[in-house]
């Protein structure tokens, strides 16, 4: 079995091939996330504590956290599940994954050093691999360099040195810097003020339209009420005329 060991403190990662099955027994029946003392792997591992991060079996199927078995299962997966990347929106697919319990059928086991031991391991703990990219967000750059709100963040951007082109080795070195996100500049403040002004303008326009509509509605109701009263008055007068004419035309006894 191969052990893919990483050390987050230095950023290094190294692959070890262990032939002796007796040394690997310390990992058997352990779940993903379990911490194991690695003293039995050899003298150079004395004092080291490793965390089981995952692995693949001999057919290449990955271990999945939460599947409490040491065999292979087929699960219906959707967006957000580990070991699966949807190709279309809302797509679900049944995929074969391995359980989160370690056994002898794994080909590669991923481990993370939680506690460093007494000795250095060549290629893993003695070197240091710097991060290729620095932070991109303005607040994270401030946090990294302990800056205040008044400091200019643009001066502290971590730039990457670009390799020189062929035939231009003596030219001025070129750097590549990320575009800072969430950076507050005068243009950003101007856009914010413009958006607020548009919002206030829309609000005033809506209130004016509502007032005009309420005024028109009240006027229409008043006109309708006047027309209804006039109609009632006209009908009443017409009925009174009809009753008078009928009384006059009736024969006297």
Curated annotation (Swiss-Prot):
The lineage of its organism: Eukaryota, Metazoa, Ecdysozoa, Arthropoda, Hexapoda. The keyword Ubl conjugation does not apply. It comes from Manduca sexta. The keyword Ribosomal protein applies. Residues 226-244 have a biased composition (Basic and acidic residues). Ribosomal protein S6 is the major substrate of protein kinases in eukaryote ribosomes. Coiled coil: none annotated. Pfam families: Ribosomal_S6e (PF01092). InterPro entries: Ribosomal_eS6, Ribosomal_eS6-like, Ribosomal_eS6_CS. One of its GO terms (cellular component) is ribonucleoprotein complex. Belongs to the eukaryotic ribosomal protein eS6 family. Keywords: Phosphoprotein, Ribonucleoprotein, Ribosomal protein. GO terms for biological process: translation. GO terms for molecular function: structural constituent of ribosome. It comes from the Eukaryota. This is Small ribosomal subunit protein eS6. Residues 209-253 are annotated as: Disordered. The gene is RpS6. Gene3D superfamilies: 1.20.5.2650. PROSITE patterns: RIBOSOMAL_S6E. Component of the 40S small ribosomal subunit. Plays an important role in controlling cell growth and proliferation through the selective translation of particular classes of mRNA.
């Amino acid at each position: 079995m191969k052990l893919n060991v990483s050390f987050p403190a230095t950023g290094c990662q190294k692959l070890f091939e262990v032939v002796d099955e007796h040394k690997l027994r310390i990992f058997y029946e352990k779940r993903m996330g379990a911490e194991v003392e690695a003293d039995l792997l050899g003298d150079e591992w004395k004092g080291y504590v490793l965390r089981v991060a995952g692995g693949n079996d001999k057919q290449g199927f990955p271990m999945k956290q939460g599947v409490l078995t040491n065999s292979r299962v087929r699960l219906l997966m959707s967006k957000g599940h580990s070991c699966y990347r949807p190709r279309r929106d809302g797509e679900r697919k049944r995929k074969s994954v391995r359980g989160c319990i370690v056994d002898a059928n794994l080909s590669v086991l991923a481990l993370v050093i939680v506690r460093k031991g007494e000795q250095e391991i060549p290629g893993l703990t003695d070197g240091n691999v710097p991060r290729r990219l620095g932070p991109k967000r303005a607040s994270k750059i401030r946090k990294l360099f302990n800056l205040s709100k008044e400091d200019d963040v643009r001066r502290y951007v971590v730039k990457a040195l670009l390799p020189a082109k062929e035939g231009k080795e003596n030219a001025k070195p070129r750097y590549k810097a990320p575009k800072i996100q969430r950076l507050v500049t005068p243009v950003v403040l101007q856009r914010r003020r413009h958006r607020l002004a548009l919002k206030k303008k829309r609000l005033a326009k809506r209130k004016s339209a509502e007032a005009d509509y309420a005024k028109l509605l009240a006027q229409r109701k008043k006109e309708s009420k006047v027309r209804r009263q006039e109609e009632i008055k006209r009908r009443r007068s017409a009925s009174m005329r009809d009753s008078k004419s009928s009384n006059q035309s009736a024969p006297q006894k």
